[in-house]
């Protein structure tokens, strides 16, 4: 797949890159998911692959790290599966990195892909690095904005 950005790259760099958050709807023309949820879940069962499950119930968040043996216990709501460096393990996903090669290599890390059921997510947080989020299959409510004071929560010392 040849993914094409719909944005004007020089304008994006000048106006937004490392300056402020922005949502660009339909930022990739004719987007097709390069990996299915089942394939992603399969990767998260491999020892070499960095993955985690984030779930919440009654305001309590919990994270567990892969590899995972089963997903049967999770139910149909309030959890997300996140898999790091998918581009290193699944060749078709590597094509998603190509449109961003205008950035220097040292700015590019990996392609993390997540799958969420209704109510799933990772909760409000600040990333300490620049992130491009590409919404694939499904629906999601994204909220982005300027940095605001947040209470630090470290459930896993």
Residue ranges and their predicted role:
Residues 19-20:
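Glycine-rich, often proline-containing surface loops adjacent to acidic residues and nearby aromatics
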């Amino acid at each position: 797949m040849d993914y094409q950005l719909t944005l004007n790259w020089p304008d994006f760099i000048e106006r937004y890159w490392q300056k402020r958050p922005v949502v660009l709807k339909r930022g990739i023309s004719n987007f097709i998911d390069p990996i299915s949820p089942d394939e992603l879940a399969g990767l998260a069962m491999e020892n070499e692959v960095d993955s985690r499950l984030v779930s919440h119930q009654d305001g309590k968040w919990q994270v567990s790290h892969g590899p995972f043996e089963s997903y049967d216990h999770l139910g149909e709501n309030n959890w997300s599966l996140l898999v790091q460096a998918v581009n290193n393990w699944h060749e078709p996903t590597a094509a998603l990195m190509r449109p961003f090669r205008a950035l220097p290599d040292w700015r590019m890390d990996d392609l993390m892909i997540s799958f969420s059921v209704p109510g799933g997510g990772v909760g409000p947080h600040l990333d300490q690095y620049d992130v491009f989020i590409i919404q694939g299959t499904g629906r999601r409510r994204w909220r982005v904005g300027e940095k605001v004071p947040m209470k630090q929560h470290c459930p896993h010392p």
